[in-house]
Every structure is written in structure tokens, then in C-alpha cells.
Amino acid sequence: MRLYFSAFRHPKRLGLCLLITLSIILLGWQCVLLYNHSPEIQRSVYTLTGLAPSSKMAFVTMLTVRAANGENEVENTQQDWYYNSTRLLVHRLVKFKPTKSKYPVVVLAMKGIDQWKLDQLQEDGAIVKVVDPLYAHEVVDDVNDIALLDSRWSMMFTKLRVFEMYEYDRICFLDSDILPIKKMDKVFDVHQLSYSKDSVLFPPTLFYKPRRSIFWRRFTEEFAAYGLTRDDLYPYVFAAVSDPGMWHETPPPFKDYFNAGLFVFKPLKAHYKRLMALARFPKLYDNANMMEQSLLNFAYNSAGAFPWESLDWTFNGLWARKNDLPYLKAVHGKHWQPEGSLGYDEDTSKLWWDAFQEMQTYHDQQRNADLY
């Protein structure tokens, strides 16, 4: 009340108060007008996922059959570093107290992996689910449309099997070369997105340029072509971390392209059906230059009908350097590789080897305890 009467005693103050009030009213009116006439803004209104306490969530990784010389070969020695890194990821999420999760860890194991490896992963505390591989020639209409197809990439579409895990309400997929260094459970705190049902600009048009072409082309989704309706596909969840690039600042600036080594999503039959339909045409997604990563970046393009949500960069420390480590919850890369390897960093490599040694010591102690 004192300020109110003071304003009347000072005309300049009264004028300033009226100007501020009028500005707030005009700004609010403009925001409402912009929202009502902008499907893009309506589409980006998020609501926190209201999951019940009984909701099933899980961390999921994948172990693939080793490939060499164009033929699948099962690695029979302990020097299979993809297997070792998978064990380390499981250990960090299941046993190691500083990073232990309250959620289960599932390993999607490609058919053909040695049984002793599967048994060991189960003994380590993982749920092991054997899946058939998805070969590129089974997914795409014409493998000649794929930019680079060799033995290393031929089975990468198998990662899409994770979208078939409908028994879970929310999944965080992690590549097996991710090393948690802090608690990761908050990665599930993502949003659920719905599209405005009365939008006249739905679905939006995307533009793509096939390799070796100088022309951009238009792509507008027709859900009926998948045998789906809009209501089948919404609401949905898909969140990932912006790819920082090998040389980046700390923290790295946002780029509208995510790394598919870690993503959080809600498994839906409709979305799996849509992904498999899009996957048939590599020209849509950079000729599958990065295989399933290229596909997912197209399917969840921020300008499309299903924009991806950006997770905090600390959940996926790709190309990590010393300056990044204090902030990260996980580092991502083949850090067991020697100096001189692509992306090698001395501090991150030491971090990985220390973690690997801790896991070995833990298992040695467990075996010794079993003798008594």
C-alpha cells in the first residue's frame, strides 16, 4: 500500500508502473497469440513422464558376434575387449557401489556368442536375452544404397531389436563401451511428448540429400503407409545426447545431431514398425553412413514429427578429455586401445584401466571367498 500511494504522489513513478503493467499484458497476449498459431511451439510443450512406482525401467546394452574378414567369427579368448567392456558396464551398474543402479541391466546378446560368455554375464548380475541378428540386406531394400557396408557394419541394425522390448516402460540403451563413473539413474527423468491434434501443418516436411546428389528432396510422412494412425504413435519418448565431436569445448555446445551410443525411449510397437519402414530407404538417412545412428537421427529429427529431446551432455562422455572428466557421469569410447588410437586420451584411458582392474580384483575376491 505504501508503494501504491507513493506512486500517486510521484507522477513519474505512476507512469513507469503503468508502462511496465501494459508491457506485461502485451507480452502475455503476444505469447498466447503465438502459441495458438504455431504448431511448432505446441509440439514442443513437454510434460514430465508420470510413471507409476511399479513401472519397469532398465538399462540395456548389446553384445554382438565378432566379425572379421567378412565372416562372423566367435572370439574364444579372454582378449575379446567388447565382451570385457560389456562385463565392465554390467559390473558398474550392478555391483560397484558408487555407480550401482536400482534398475536391472539387460544384455541383448546376438545369437552365436559363446555360451560361457552368456553364463558369465548372468553370473555378473545381468539379464541375458539372446536375439537374432538383423543384417543390412534384411533391413534395406537395396544394400547398394548404403554408403559403406563391410563386416563391421553389416549387423549394426541389430541394435533396433531394443525397440521390441515392449515389456519395459522405459529403456536407456547404452553401447557396451560406455563406462559409468557416477550414478546414472537420473537419465530416466525425461519427458513425454505429444503433438497438437488440431495442427494443420502436421506432419512437417523434411528435406534430405542422397549422397552423390546435388539436389535436396522433400519427405512428408504418411502414417497410413505404415498401417498406423497418429494416436498409435503419440505420446512417445526419445532422448539422447548431442554429439560433441572429437575436439570440443567444456561443456560442448549443442549440435542438432545426437550420438546413438546412449538414448532413452519408450518401447512402442508402432515406433518399431515405423523405424523398420524408414530403414528400408537409406537415401533418406545419409545413405546409412553411420548405420542405425543415421536412421535414428532422421526418424527423430528435431524438425520432424518426432523431435528428440536433448539429455544433459554428462550422461554420454564421447571423446572425453581431462577437462571433461570432473563433470561426466559416463565416458564413452574404446579406452582399452593403446596410445595413438583414434580418440586416445591418457587420463580417460587410465580411468578405464583402473575401473577394469577394480572389477578383476572384485571377482578374484569373490572366487577366493567361495573357497572357504
Swiss-Prot record:
Superkingdom in the source lineage: Eukaryota
GO aspect biological process, one term: meiotic cell cycle
Signal peptide limits: 1-34
Cellular component GO terms held in the UniProt record: cytoplasm; endoplasmic reticulum; Golgi apparatus
Keyword Endoplasmic reticulum attached: yes
Protein's cellular compartments: Cytoplasm; Endoplasmic reticulum; Golgi apparatus
Record keywords, A-Z: Cytoplasm, Endoplasmic reticulum, Golgi apparatus, Meiosis, Signal
InterPro entries, alphabetized: GNT1/Glycosyltrans_8, Nucleotide-diphossugar_trans
Keyword DNA-binding on entry: no
GO molecular function: alpha-1,3-galactosyltransferase activity; glycosyltransferase activity
Function: Has a role in meiosis.
The name this protein goes by in its record: Meiotically up-regulated gene 136 protein
Species: Schizosaccharomyces pombe (strain 972 / ATCC 24843) (Fission yeast)
